[in-house]
Amino acid sequence: MKYGIVLFPSKKLQDLANSYRKRYDPSYSLIPPHLTLRASFECAEEKADQLVSHLRNIAKESHPLVLKMTKYSSFAPVNNVIYIKAEPTEELKTLNEKLYTGVLAGEQEYNFVPHVTVGQNLSDDEHSDVLGQLKMQEVSHEEIVDRFHLLYQLENGSWTVYETFLLGRGE
């Protein structure tokens, strides 16, 4: 089964992201706006209990964190993804690193760049045009996030919550 680990931001930030995702993100209908803490991975269903136990322990030893969104940016020229950048705080980086330990041990494919995607799979021209417009807009959003979510992918490609973990409590 394919899993992923994410933070879901507040409705206010999700609404902002969705105002662009509706038009510029083909994954709009498959998953709500989110910040990926650990890239998707495969795990046998019979190991799900081990996975959940490990994530509970990580949540228990972690604390709620500040999510501060600072600007629009892009992964171009590597790929044409436009996103709202989150400040990479120590707490966020530490949580990301913990999600590559124990039963989740493995190498990260990319450096951790905390963000919420607003557009992807854009042509070069569309990417340049949309990013140019967004960079003229100011982003100043801050919130406290007190949970992360283990998601799994359904057969139709959409993602749904398997379990939610409260930071500082492990529940």
From Swiss-Prot:
Superkingdom of source: Bacteria
Motif placement: HXTX 2: 115-118
Enzyme Commission no: 3.1.-.-
Active site: 34, 115
HXTX 1, short sequence motif: residues: 34-37
Keywords: Hydrolase
InterPro entries, per the entry: 2H_phosphoesterase_YjcG-like, Cyclic_Pdiesterase, YjcG
Family label: Belongs to the 2H phosphoesterase superfamily. YjcG family.
PANTHER family for the chain: PHOSPHOESTERASE SAOUHSC_00951-RELATED (PTHR40037:SF1), PHOSPHOESTERASE YJCG-RELATED (PTHR40037)
Protein name: Putative phosphoesterase YjcG
Organism name: Bacillus subtilis (strain 168)
Organism lineage: Bacteria, Bacillati, Bacillota, Bacilli, Bacillales
